[in-house]
Amino acid sequence: MTNSSTAAHSPLPPLSLYIHIPWCVQKCPYCDFNSHAQKSDIPEQDYINHLITDLEQDLTYFHHSVKNRRLHSIFIGGGTPSLFSAQGIAFLLSEIKHRIPFSPDIEITLEANPGTVETERFLGYTQAGVNRISMGIQSFNDDKLRVLGRIHNAIEAKSAVDFARVLRSQDKLDSFNLDLMHGLPNQTVEQALDDLRQAIELAPPHLSWYQLTIEPNTMFAYRPPTLPNDDELWDIFEQGHQLLTAAGYQQYETSAYAKPGFQCKHNLNYWRFGDYLAIGCGAHGKLSFADENSATVNEIIRYSKTKHPRGYLHGEYLYEQKNVAKSDRTFEFFMNRFRLLEPVPKAEFEQLTGLSQSTVESQMIFALKQGYITENPESWQITEHGKLFLNELLELFLESE
């Protein structure tokens, strides 16, 4: 592998770390994530030890990319990471920090299920170093929660959010996010908007508001429920977007809304084509490499870890690794970048893909004519029209080189 630049002006993007904890209380019928229903005691300490060894191997194997870099953010996802004790999370974060430095303003997010978090555990996570909690609320309607297979009810959800608000008021938590879904089975427009109003009333700094989609190999795929039609979905989105905007939330990504200054750093790094280490069952990572004193990236790799806990707990970590060909980089870059509503700096395209702007000139001319984007000398900007035709826009880059 090629050496990364150690110069002050390295072309490498920010570096994050994703940690996957695969266990949950029960598998939700819509979930296609790598999660495994808890059937016995979770081997918490054993798994944490393997996570640390996994990270050590990555830091050695990918040394030319990660040397002299600090972690910009950490995201602990699942599964249900809040099944792990606060002591376990504290030990894990401490061991990580001993192996790779943290940025002074690092964002550390932990996903939590309201049905698995007591107030003491919440407090313990913040004492462990977690400064952002992401809560999988999904709905405040108990009937919908049952259909979705969630283990919490609306009262438990609001109680968890209230405690997160208290922790934030005490400066023990920088931010918190609520995950909320719409387009649920047999959901009316008014029910979806009522969910959103209740979420807004709780004043989270960040809201992830996304449409339920039926994914392959899920229980919903085998027994499809009745979902709102396209007209109803459009009404939900349009009226919901107005509610969020009126409440002071800014949409910065397809499904992400935040109060000013509370965008999720970790997800922004994904969408800005940043780098991320990945440890844990089924975790996916991306790393860039650059030659000494180079102004641009010249190699990008993607890799994934062993999915099943059985193999992972036997020390079989790395499952697959591949180089991202130059012919694929434009599509991958814009597939991420055009999810964001901010301008795309042309200089960053060259820096992070190692390609010249001329490689996408014809595609951009066509996109301009179609009204998918606007352009100035420094950047490209997706339009409202472009958001509606995002797939058509991205198809332009499938074979560019």
Language model features: what each stretch is:
Residues 2-16, 33-62, 69-355:
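C-terminal scaffold of the Radical SAM
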Residues 22-35:
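Local cysteine-cluster metal-coordination motifs and their immediate loop/turn environment
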Residues 24, 205, 275, 378-379:
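Beta-strand-connecting loop/turn residues
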Residues 354-366:
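Short amphipathic alpha-helical interaction segments
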Residues 369-378:
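A short, conserved structural fragment
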Residues 380-387:
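Basic, amphipathic "hinge/linker" alpha-helix immediately C-terminal to the N-terminal HTH DNA-binding motif
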Residues 387-401:
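Short, amphipathic alpha-helical interaction segments positioned at domain boundaries
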